[in-house]
UniProtKB/Swiss-Prot annotation:
Predominant location category: cytoplasm
Protein's organism: Pseudomonas paraeruginosa (strain DSM 24068 / PA7) (Pseudomonas aeruginosa (strain PA7))
GO terms under cellular component: cytoplasm
Name of the molecule in the record: 33 kDa chaperonin
Lineage of source species: Bacteria, Pseudomonadati, Pseudomonadota, Gammaproteobacteria, Pseudomonadales
Molecular function in Gene Ontology: protein folding chaperone; unfolded protein binding
């Protein structure tokens, strides 16, 4: 299997169904390198990364897709972002003492809520919310699409702390098959075959092998893979803008409280940005410079 992170689209020639597969290794490892997550949390975060990458691949937009899960349990927050140029990042909040070995989504995130946000550069923001119901994240997402006025969509996800993989099938508007019964039969046939794929096979097999294993009797067109990379969009400029939005009085108060330097830490990548009194003065003097103060991880 290729070790380059990628998503790859495929189409069935004889029916109105498309698919997407995603493989994350390096970017997944970079996300995990930023925080020492327990294994069950790392696995769930990997599934979220794969899911967001799959969803982003089905959309034609310029902007950001955010997948966020909140709960009252040991993992109160999971958050993953995937941009339209296929850059991903993610984080989790957890209570280590409350996490048992082998815990799944329902144990980690009871009474959870999943929010899907599509934030385009231009146009209206979209947000969908669904309860975290189901055995796993794939089932929860599949249920969301089944219960909303969306195209029928199914997910298969797995992650093991080293690799995150995902498979998506989505029924398209009627074109090749017009008869509703034929469309439903085709959809059920393809998803039933996908249900035979084990979690271990999803992690171990490359895309071509997975598709042959499931659909060797179907006519499938596999498109060129698209790269995915880890990238954190934090910057010194964004941090400076956040301080400006607080106002000069609050920033000066923070300088006093933090003994002469305001510290801003990125929750995603742990990058640290420091602003001393001179930096803050420049911000509010309109100098347009955030200065050369050191940053560190």
């Amino acid at each position: 299997m290729s070790h380059s992170d990628q998503s790859q689209r495929f189409l069935f020639d004889d029916t109105d169904v498309r698919g997407e597969m995603v493989d994350l290794e390096r970017s997944y490892s970079e996300v995990l390198a930023k925080h020492p997550y327990p294994e069950p949390v790392a696995q769930l975060l990997g599934e979220m990364l794969a899911a967001a990458s799959l969803l982003c691949g089905t959309l034609k937009f310029d902007g950001l897709l955010v997948l966020q899960a909140r709960s009252s349990g040991a993992v109160p927050l999971l958050m993953v972002e995937c941009s339209s140029d296929r850059q991903v990042r993610g984080l989790a909040r957890y209570s280590a003492e409350a996490i048992g070995a082998g815990a799944g989504m329902q144990e980690l995130m009871p009474e959870g809520v999943l929010t899907l946000t599509v934030d385009p550069v231009k146009g209206q923001r979209y947000q969908g919310i669904v309860a975290l119901e189901g055995v796993n994240l794939a089932e929860c997402l599949s249920n969301y699409f089944a219960s909303s006025e969306q195209l029928p969509t199914r997910f298969w996800l797995n992650a093991d702390g080293r690799r995150a993989r995902g498979l998506l099938l989505q029924q398209l508007p009627a074109d090749r098959l017009k008869d509703p019964e034929a469309r439903e039969a085709s959809w059920q046939h393809l998803t039933t075959l996908a249900d035979t794929l084990t979690a271990e096979e999803l992690l171990a097999l490359d895309n071509e092998t997975v598709l042959h294993r499931l659909y060797h009797e179907e006519t499938v067109r596999l498109f060129e893979p698209q790269p995915l990379v880890f990238h954190c969009s934090c910057s010194r400029e964004r941090s400076a803008n956040a301080l400006v939005s607080l106002g000069q009085a609050d920033c000066e108060r923070l300088l006093e409280e933090e003994e002469g330097a305001i510290t801003i830490d990125c929750q995603f990548c742990n990058q640290r940005y420091l602003f001393d009194a001179s930096d803050v003065a420049q911000l509010f003097a309109g100098a347009g410079s955030q200065g050369p103060s050191a940053t560190r991880h």
